[in-house]
């Protein structure tokens, strides 16, 4: 699926002043495109509010990042679980009313998660970098910043908030973007989980190379339906090029039971990312224990 970036606003000049004129007739074609367009605006505003130099100064005072990839590889329970701290989503609305990131993070750590994922998008997922900071102050597990990254600035935001890894979504980034953002992330000590949804995106990612974490999202971006066969089909199609002995493959979305984890593990997934299935449970720690079979 092609995701367009919003066209730059045309400029008009009045005397010595220049103004941007919005494209009122241009509309996003789907929810992901809408998120991307809003994220562009959000990042522009964030840059004005918190200059990059301010983020760099904060980062210089932080301890080194934790090794996200190593944590997944050394997990005692397989597949390793990346448990997600998520209040809401565009497709499901509010998932957890009594959303307490600190309590959830503690429950995940006690329940056997190898790493945590934290939603930082505010408008569509009701998350935030403040949530990431709270979780970082609560647990010692490696943290993934789950964000719609379009700009290097967001990588600095993630690192400054305590992330150890970041998500790059192939569907919303060009090959050039993926290469550059991966390079910037590595310079900040951040591991990168690059996410694909179909064969075309996985082909692009493998051609670019340099990713030690590849996520296969089982959710169809057009319908938002999930199908675990997505992981099975893509791994089978690209098995010889995935280098599963060195690359950590993560299956994402649609995982609700231990049988689901067993299914994607049999296909080749060394780790899984689980959010909604846990967030909807009253006792998150017990739910995670049950999911991993511990």
From Swiss-Prot:
One of its GO terms (biological process) is L-tryptophan biosynthetic process. SUPFAM superfamilies: Ribulose-phoshate binding barrel. Its EC number is 4.1.1.48. GO terms for molecular function: indole-3-glycerol-phosphate synthase activity; phosphoribosylanthranilate isomerase activity. CDD domains: IGPS (cd00331). It catalyses: 1-(2-carboxyphenylamino)-1-deoxy-D-ribulose 5-phosphate + H(+) = (1S,2R)-1-C-(indol-3-yl)glycerol 3-phosphate + CO2 + H2O. Keywords: Amino-acid biosynthesis, Aromatic amino acid biosynthesis, Decarboxylase, Lyase, Tryptophan biosynthesis. It holds the Pfam family IGPS. InterPro entries: Aldolase_TIM, Indole-3-glycerol_P_synth, Indole-3-glycerol_P_synth_dom, Indole-3-GlycerolPSynthase_CS, RibuloseP-bd_barrel. PANTHER family: INDOLE-3-GLYCEROL-PHOSPHATE SYNTHASE, TRYPTOPHAN BIOSYNTHESIS PROTEIN. Pathway: Amino-acid biosynthesis; L-tryptophan biosynthesis; L-tryptophan from chorismate: step 4/5. It comes from Synechococcus sp. (strain CC9902). Belongs to the TrpC family. The lineage of its organism: Bacteria, Bacillati, Cyanobacteriota, Cyanophyceae, Synechococcales. PROSITE patterns: IGPS. It is an enzyme of class 4 (lyase). This is Indole-3-glycerol phosphate synthase. HAMAP family: IGPS_B.
